[in-house]
Swiss-Prot record:
Belongs to the NnrD/CARKD family. The keyword Manganese does not apply. (6S)-NADPHX binds at residues 40, 103, 153, 216. Homotetramer. InterPro entries: Carbohydrate_kinase_pred_CS (IPR017953), CARKD (IPR000631), Ribokinase-like (IPR029056). Residues 5-273 form the YjeF C-terminal domain. Gene3D superfamilies: 3.40.1190.20. It comes from Enterococcus faecalis (strain ATCC 700802 / V583). This is ADP-dependent (S)-NAD(P)H-hydrate dehydratase. It is an enzyme of class 4 (lyase). GO terms for molecular function: ADP-dependent NAD(P)H-hydrate dehydratase activity; ATP binding; NAD(P)HX epimerase activity.
Length: 291
């Protein structure tokens, strides 16, 4: 087991090359937010943008377009019903996050089916929230499981892995991860990341973070990190640790840690831990273009 510390942030977060432009930091598509749960996708979007994604597009119910533009004017918005545009946007993404506030209705099932069918080898796909439940209940499969990240809490992991919570031991979780072939960010008071190698365990987090939207915010940070930094398990771990580090610092003064406060603090914390890059600017940008 590898225990996360601030070292992971210095390993992952790098200063931006001087000749950067927005496309160098990834195209992210976030999908979710039905009429009832629009706040979930808005919080994911805010976290994704504040964690540094270059271009962010949100596919959501039309009822959420106004609130999302008001809260996150940096994001572009597409409606669930805009099938052709939706398909084109997903095709062009570097990272896709589906699930926050998506719901479990026929529209949600149809969108998940489309995203799974369109998933390309070069794309990272993050499956969160109700999309995990839909995936668990449906006859779905993964074309490139090694490029998929599931972000379940323990009950969602029970549905996905068929392991009752009391049987979710380290060994059992590792076996189920191997069967899926994807990365599992298993959220709990000590979130653990299961992948093909040695698991990571988070050392941060606090009871003040036990509030709605915390997981949506984490999913958005993971998406933003994968879009702009090296697409590795360490990058996912860095997102997990930074989320809890900010939460722990806020908990020193706040009884409840609002997820939106975590998002607002992201640029400041990332600036603090960003390390100089060793390759020339032109080489770094070329690596990003060819990913």
């Amino acid at each position: 087991m590898r225990y996360l510390s601030k070292d992971i942030l210095e390993e992952v977060i790098t200063q931006r090359p001087s000749d950067s432009y927005k496309s160098n930091f990834g195209r992210v598509v976030l999908i979710g937010g039905n009429r009832q749960y629009g706040g979930a996708i808005i919080m994911s979007t805010e976290a994704c943008i504040n964690s540094g994604a270059g271009l962010t597009t949100v596919i959501t119910d039309v009822k959420n377009h106004g609130p999302l533009h008001a809260r996150c004017p940096e994001a572009m918005v597409v409606g669930f019903e805009e099938t052709v545009l939706l398909t084109n946007v997903v095709e062009q993404a570097d990272v896709i996050l589906i699930g926050p506030g998506l719901g479990l209705d026929a529209t949600a099932q149809q969108i998940l089916k489309m995203v799974l069918a369109q998933h390309q080898k070069q794309q990272w796909l993050i499956i969160d929230g109700s999309a995990i439940t839909l995936f668990s209940q449906g006859n779905f499969s993964l074309t490139y499981p090694e490029k998929v990240v599931f972000t379940p809490h323990q009950m969602e992991w029970q549905r996905l892995s068929h392991l009752p919570i009391e049987q979710q031991t380290l060994a059992n979780n590792q076996r189920q991860q191997a069967k899926l072939g994807s990365t599992i960010v298993l959220k709990s008071h000590r979130t653990t990341i299961f992948h093909a190698g040695e698991p990571f365990q988070n050392t941060g987090g606090n009871p003040g973070m036990a509030t709605g939207g915390t997981g949506d915010t984490l999913a958005g940070i993971i998406a933003g990190f994968l879009a702009q930094f090296k697409p590795t398990i360490e990058t996912i771990a860095g997102a997990v640790y930074l989320h809890s580090l900010i939460g722990d610092d806020l908990a020193k003064t706040d009884y409840v840690v609002l997820p939106t406060k975590i998002s607002q603090a992201l640029p400041t914390y990332m600036k603090k831990y960003a390390q100089p890059h060793t390759a020339p600017d032109s080489e770094l940008l070329e690596q990003k273009r060819s990913r």
